[in-house]
């Protein structure tokens, strides 16, 4: 799951993993995440925009935060 999130983030934000200064806790807004790119990432990750998940992801815009939220959703429904 982490690799999928990382690949999507790197693709949409045009960054490399080395740009994550604080590792997976790096605030993606510091790397160019804005509302348009957020929507692109939600599409790329297959997140249902009608669910509450996008707002939970927006509250913690980091790879680590997204991994926690997405794994929790997979556990809830898995």
Curated annotation (Swiss-Prot):
InterPro entries the record matches: ACP-like_sf, PP-bd_ACP
Location of O-(pantetheine 4'-phosphoryl)serine modifications: 35
GO biological process: fatty acid metabolic process
Leader sequence residues: none
Recorded superkingdom: Bacteria
A Pfam family it matches: PP-binding
Annotated Carrier domain residues: 1-78
Pathway: Lipid metabolism; fatty acid metabolism
Protein name: Acyl carrier protein Rv0100
């Amino acid at each position: 799951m982490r690799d999928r999130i990382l690949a999507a983030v790197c693709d949409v934000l045009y960054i490399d993993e080395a740009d994550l200064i604080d590792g997976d806790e790096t605030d993606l807004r510091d790397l160019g995440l804005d509302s348009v790119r957020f929507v692109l990432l939600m599409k790329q990750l297959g997140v249902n925009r009608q669910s509450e998940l996008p707002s939970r992801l927006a509250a913690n815009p980091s790879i680590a935060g997204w991994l926690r939220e997405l794994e929790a959703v997979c556990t809830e429904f898995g």
